């Protein structure tokens, strides 16, 4: 026997879900829909990468829907950045045809972390990467380039801190501590 409280709760929950769906508009639209700008796909991919989404296998799946490749190689290093700018206006792009464009992204790079040695090489530069985006099955997909993770400085410091907490080997802990300090002090 179903009580009126259960039915009331169910209807209330259903109404909340309906309000959420109706109020979200484009929020529930398929990521990378061809109806939206291809720069939206590039911007979202680069934002997620900046936040460290490609640093581990579990979170790397969040960016996979934006790319034309299924797997990435095991990168030996991570590019550490201060920020990035995506060219959002079509006049700044190279338009190949209706379903293919090249969108430039400018990164403010401060250096690279080499994962095997836990070493940081500071190399301040502005890097321009040209993302080729194609319309594939009614979705925009980044088809090239496949580049190493470009992670923000703060996120990289936190990533190293997490590794330091988990590490049990005293020598590796010391090296991670040095790396964390180098990353904190890195300047433009």
Predicted regions and their residues:
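Low-complexity, intrinsically disordered terminal/linker segments enriched in charged
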Residues: 34, 38, 42, 46, ...
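Beta-strand-connecting loop/turn residues
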Residues: 15, 99, 138-139
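Bacterial N-terminal signal peptides
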Residues: 9-23
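N-terminal secretory signal peptides that target proteins for export/translocation
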Residues: 1-9
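Surface-exposed, charged secondary-structure patches
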Residues: 33, 72-126, 177-188
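Sec/Tat signal peptide C-region and signal peptidase I cleavage site
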Residues: 25-29
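Core segments of small alpha/beta cavity-forming domains
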Residues: 30-83, 170-174, 178-188
